[in-house]
Amino acid sequence: MAIITLPYRYLERLAGTDRQTIIDRVPMIGADIERIEDDHVDVEFFPNRPDLYSPEGVARAMRGFLGIEEGLPAYTVRPSGIAFSVDPGLADIRPFLGSAVIRNVNLDEEAIESLMALQEALHWAVGRGRGKVAIGVHDLDTVTPPFRYIASPRNRSFVPLDFEREMTMEEMLADHPKGRDYAHLVENFDTFPLIVDAENRVLSFPPIINGELTRVTAATKNILLDCTGTDRRAVMTAVNIICTALIEAGATVETVTVEGEEMPTLAPAERVVSVAECSRLLGLSLTPQEMAGLLRRMRFDAEPDGDSRVRILVPCYRSDILHDWDIFEDVAIAYGIENFDAALPATSTVAQEHPIPAVAGAVRSVMTGLGYLEAIPFTLTNERVLYANMQREPAPGTLRLLHPISEEQTVVRTDLLPLLMEMLLANKHRELPQRLFAVGDVVEDCVTYLKVAAVSIHPAADFSEAYAAADVLCRELSLSYTVVESADPAFLDGRRGDIVVDGKIVGVFGEIHPAVLGAFDLEHPVAALALDLTAVPGYPALPDTP
């Protein structure tokens, strides 16, 4: 979770209240206070509220929560006349660009630190370590529009931020601290993303580093914001959060034309929610008027829509609002978590551990004892990772998303091993050996069950290592098994084995096939195993598949 530093003097001015009130009430909007210092307080917010990752965002929320200023913040934008073009050659690298012009900023040292902290927090929470989104903030008055986002030769040179000499982009990946940290995001591409102005001067090498030319200082009055990435929704989330935070600080926002699209609009989204459903979930008896009033304190526009519904406008910066229940959570916060009456459950039972988490816990104990580090892959993935890269045929029972928002997340995972291979790719710049395991749900034929997978990558990884780990795991799980030669194409012929229990293949282990290593751009051998945990004694029987 992100820890945000909130300077008292700045926050008091923006929030319109005193520091003690802020300290007393900020935990009620979903924060944990980490440290209280003489001039600031450090507060930890959950990753689902990146709009609170700045003093400006916290002040906006506190004004509503305390009843100082309720309802939807009024944001207006006007056209800047500035245009941005996007090179089609970036389609497979970082295809999406979001931008805005922010004028009349007042950047003292404290405000610059706040802006940079917001940028880095968004890189973590929204950008997934700059993989999905990278943010650039530039002094607009040092460059000349229009701007171009291009696929550049790798030997293009410019002066990177905090350096005094020109370097090629390849040199930056090796010698610049940010280059070393994020080289893995671009180093495998033939060309690199680059942002240049009308005079072909470099503003930024996303997602690595800005140019020294556009450094933001206390003298900066007008900012050009760029957000590049692989996920359009995440890119625009970052744009909206930064723009609205700076508006709270007194700036004005102007749109930029990106490939014919004016952005940002900062327009709210409309929803209609049920009062009865909210009341049932929260154990309250709310009227539409009461519910609308509570939502206005959470900075929504809300009005009763008949006798049973409330029509609301959701601020553009609230990227966490995905479902009606997210709205109901805000109703509970505005009502006051401390105002809910504690009640004992209606029934009393004797508890015991469910067998499925018991099996998962046993697996974790064994694998960590073998020196493996647990990873938690995403539940959603795509068929390229699951099947094509692994040289496997698609499983007929794969559950596909009807309306995926990203090409990277189109199906629910049916296996964990491909996702661990993807994690090895993401960490190939880290030192070896790396040993990872994952235990979690997979879905086939609309049935959810538990699997485990493990990988070990280093120059000496081999069949014996995978066999030894599989043997220890099966014995510790009380599995009576035999091993037969496997035909799994993800593994190397002659160095692979199937785990058989009661005549059924329930797992596989061995050395990953070189073609699979190549598909994941891995340069060292990988020993791996995978096991279906429904074979473990005591695992509940699965329902019949449709």
Curated annotation (Swiss-Prot):
A GO biological-process term: phenylalanyl-tRNA aminoacylation
InterPro entries: aa-tRNA-synth_II/BPL/LPL, B3/B4_tRNA-bd, DNA-bd_dom_put_sf, Phe-tRNA-ligase_IIc_bsu, Phe-tRNA-synth_IIc_bsu_arc_euk, Phe-tRNA_synthase-like_B3/B4, Phe_tRNA_ligase_beta2_arc, PheRS_beta_core
Keyword Metal-binding: yes
Record bears the keyword Plastid: no
Keywords, alphabetical: Aminoacyl-tRNA synthetase, ATP-binding, Cytoplasm, Ligase, Magnesium, Metal-binding, Nucleotide-binding, Protein biosynthesis
SMART domains: B3_4, B5
Residues engaged in binding Mg(2+): D320, D326, E329, D330
Secretion signal span: none
Gene Ontology molecular-function annotations: ATP binding; magnesium ion binding; phenylalanine-tRNA ligase activity; RNA binding
Subcellular localization, as worded in the UniProt entry: Cytoplasm
Domain B5: 266-342
Pfam family, one: tRNA_synthFbeta
Listed EC numbers: 6.1.1.20
Swiss-Prot/TrEMBL catalytic activity: tRNA(Phe) + L-phenylalanine + ATP = L-phenylalanyl-tRNA(Phe) + AMP + diphosphate + H(+)
Cofactor: Mg(2+)
GO cellular component: phenylalanine-tRNA ligase complex
Primary enzyme class: ligase
Subunit comment: Tetramer of two alpha and two beta subunits.
Family listed: Belongs to the phenylalanyl-tRNA synthetase beta subunit family. Type 2 subfamily.
Protein name as catalogued: Phenylalanine--tRNA ligase beta subunit
Taxonomic path: Archaea, Methanobacteriati, Methanobacteriota, Stenosarchaea group, Methanomicrobia
